[in-house]
UniProtKB/Swiss-Prot annotation:
Record site feature (Required for activity), residues: S362
InterPro entries given in the database record: ATP_synth_asu-like_sf (IPR023366), ATP_synth_asu_C (IPR000793), ATP_synth_asu_C_sf (IPR038376), ATP_synth_F1_a_nt-bd_dom (IPR033732), ATP_synth_F1_asu (IPR005294), ATPase_a/bsu_AS (IPR020003), ATPase_F1/V1/A1_a/bsu_N (IPR004100), ATPase_F1/V1/A1_a/bsu_N_sf (IPR036121)
Topological relation to the membrane, as annotated: Peripheral membrane protein
Species of the source: Dehalococcoides mccartyi (strain ATCC BAA-2100 / JCM 16839 / KCTC 5957 / BAV1)
Biological classification of the source: Bacteria, Bacillati, Chloroflexota, Dehalococcoidia, Dehalococcoidales
Cellular compartment(s): Cell membrane
Leader peptide range in chain numbering: none
NCBIfam families assigned to the protein according to its UniProt record, in alphabetical order: atpA (TIGR00962), PRK13343.1 (NF009884)
The protein's name: ATP synthase subunit alpha
Length: 503
């Protein structure tokens, strides 16, 4: 062989050695049927449950039914361009979402894609949407309050960090308002809030985002939105996405709050998906695993023990009832999963008692362990007293002339407490001020005030305390206890305010 020929051979050998094309294997199938947001695919025999699939044009889908000779997938986008015979690739990734601090202040869809036009999100990491809930050993008892800023709730139905408290009521009774007030009240605090909008109108979600921005709440809030015009599969995934975002903060030792608005629409979306996937229907055409749908979501809310960082994820699911029927299928399911419920009554709402919390049906199973000692001291008997007042008020409709003096006094005080517990929307009250007004009410300082002037008394008291006795409010807020000295100063303040009051 000539020298030139040897040179060519050596060059070829060198190039062969340097050649290192990466070898990859992709599982590919083909669409055999498509329609109503569902695609049946042949050939993806190794597909996993909840695996992301890629359709032509970059449209994603999720494998939900793994059958003997095909896979049924829900399409997470527009399906009009997908046709029979199209190639489908398995991505090998389980459905996931970007998580981390970069999400705060953003509006995203359930796959973490931004919807607010503020550019791409700086992702710190990703998390799977579905995850097994923390077990009993990993948890810690709930003993730190989530201050909602709503007097009726903080005093009588306290919510703790790591609790799951259901907000339930008919349409237009103020369910979303309670959740938004709670988010707004966390301004300047350490609680990261996630608001999940499921099947809402895009205009309503835009209004909520604008409202949160107006009150400075988007600085600690993430909005996950799957609108009514979006694919039903996105509505099904939305709460799990919100939960995954919250879990990231919980596992970093921080506290997070997630609002699911609302799980009734989530159940409807799952029913629609299940029927399209030809799963056998059960009661009210819901699939048989409807309870598991919500239990596996809500069980992920927890307070972790100190070894795991002591973080927490609090859940506020919302359920819409029809004509006050709390015993319907979806409401009873969620009531049995959660640690209590706040029931909003249409009659109270229409009578101007807002928030329209029905104290008799509402309950917090965590109870006073999620209250500060100061609130516990002033509101200890309030729930029972209000329950008794409601019974007496119903009885007194037949006339009060024959009632004894103590019963009449109880009715009078009950009317004043009801007025004190009324509150305007988006006007959360700090915990120290709540303690002050409840102390005044339950110790008879409002007994001589006309019922119609109670709200004026309350707003005047707040201004008076801020101007002349700010140290009392500071002491209650810092110590979370009404010490003997603080109580003495508070009594002095209330006496002075009463003297200067023109009734």
């Amino acid at each position: 062989m000539s020298a030139r020929g040897q040179d060519i051979v050596s060059i070829i050998k060198e190039q062969i050695k340097e050649f290192g094309a990466p070898v990859s294997m992709t599982s590919v199938g083909s669409v055999i049927e498509v329609g109503d947001g569902i695609a049946r695919i042949h050939g993806l025999s190794n597909a996993k449950y909840n695996e992301l699939l890629e359709f032509p044009g970059g449209v994603l889908g999720i494998a939900l039914n793994l059958e003997e000779d095909s896979v049924a997938a829900v399409i997470l986008g527009e399906d009009s361009n997908i046709k029979e015979g199209d190639e489908v690739k398995a991505t090998g990734r389980i459905s996931e979402i970007t998580v981390g601090k970069g999400m705060i202040g953003r509006v995203v869809d359930p796959l973490g894609r931004p919807l607010d036009g503020k550019g791409p999100i700086k992702a710190e990491s990703t998390r799977p949407l579905e995850r097994i809930a923390p077990n009993v050993v990993d948890r810690k008892s709930v003993n730190t309050p989530v201050q909602t800023g709503i007097k009726a709730i903080d005093a009588m139905i306290p919510i703790g960090r790591g609790q799951r408290e259901l907000i339930i009521g008919d349409r237009s009774t103020g369910k979303t308002a309670i959740a938004l007030d709670t988010i707004i009240n966390q301004k300047g605090g350490d609680l990261v809030c996630i608001y999940v909008a499921i099947g809402q109108k895009a205009s309503k979600v835009a209004r909520i985002v604008a409202l949160l921005e107006q009150y400075g709440a988007m600085e600690h809030t993430i909005v996950v939105a799957a609108n009514s015009s979006d694919a039903v599969a996105l509505q099904y995934l939305a709460p799990y996405a919100g939960c995954a975002i919250g879990e990231e903060f919980m596992e970093q030792g921080k506290d997070a709050l997630v609002v699911y608005d609302d799980l009734t629409k989530h159940a409807w979306a799952y029913r629609q998906l299940s029927l399209l996937l030809r799963r056998p229907p059960g009661r009210e055409a819901y699939p048989g695993d409807l309870f598991y749908l919500h239990s596996r979501l809500l069980e992920r809310a927890a307070r972790l023990n100190d070894k795991l960082g002591g973080g927490s994820l609090t859940a506020l699911p919302i359920i819409e009832t029809q004509a006050g029927d709390v015993s319907a299928y979806v409401p009873t399911n969620v009531i049995s999963i959660t640690d209590g419920q706040i029931y909003l009554e249409p009659d109270m709402f229409n009578a101007g008692i807002r928030p329209a919390v029905n104290v008799g049906i509402s309950v917090s199973r965590v109870g006073s362990s999620a209250q500060t000692k100061a609130m516990k001291k002033v509101a200890g008997k309030l729930k029972m007293d209000m329950g008794q007042y409601r019974e007496l008020a119903a009885f007194a409709q037949f006339g009060t002339s024959e009632l004894d003096k103590s019963t009449r006094m109880q009715l009078e005080r009950g009317q004043r407490v009801t007025e004190v517990l009324k509150q305007g929307q988006y006007q959360p009250v700090p915990a120290a001020k709540q303690v002050a007004i409840l102390y005044a009410t339950l110790n008879g300082y409002l007994d001589n005030i006309e019922v119609g002037k109670v709200r004026d008394y309350e707003s005047g008291l707040y201004r008076f305390l801020e101007a002349n006795f700010a140290s009392v409010l500071t002491a209650i807020a810092k110590e979370n206890v009404i010490s003997a000295d603080t109580e003495k100063t508070l009594k002095t303040a209330l006496d002075e305010y009463k003297k200067g009051l023109v009734v």
